[in-house]
């Protein structure tokens, strides 16, 4: 949606001018290069992700919540704002026991490893 509104966005050249080629990486790469439209996309993405994470924490109160997928390779560009929003929005923000939010260690191999373990 933002790309359609901003035809001069760097995101277009990063995805070869085809909207269907745009990924989360496209937005993060363009944001790091100073593209304001991409920065808005990343901010919106992080806010939606934080909403889901906060809901999971508030409902299930897990000790650890793992986040996976390719977007986790963005490191602090993803985690710092995500953790700040989650900390401010979760019900248990003043509790001694806080949910640890971690990047899944298996990365993009998690699905295939899980499928292999299922057959055992």
Task: Identify the residue ranges that each predicted region occupies.
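ATP-binding/phosphotransfer module of carbohydrate and carboxylate kinases, centering on a glycine-rich
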Residues: 1-120
């Amino acid at each position: 949606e933002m790309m359609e509104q901003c035809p001069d966005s760097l995101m277009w050249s990063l995805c070869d001018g085809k909207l269907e080629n745009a990924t989360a990486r496209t937005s993060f790469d363009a944001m790091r290069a100073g593209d304001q439209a991409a920065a808005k996309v990343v901010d919106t993405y992080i806010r939606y992700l934080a909403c889901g994470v906060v809901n999971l924490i508030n409902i299930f109160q897990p000790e650890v919540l793992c986040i996976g997928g390719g977007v986790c390779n963005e490191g602090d560009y993803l985690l710092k704002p995500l953790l700040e929003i989650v900390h401010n929005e979760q019900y248990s923000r003043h509790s001694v026991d806080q949910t640890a939010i971690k990047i899944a260690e298996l990365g993009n191999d998690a699905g295939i490893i899980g499928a292999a373990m299922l057959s055992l």
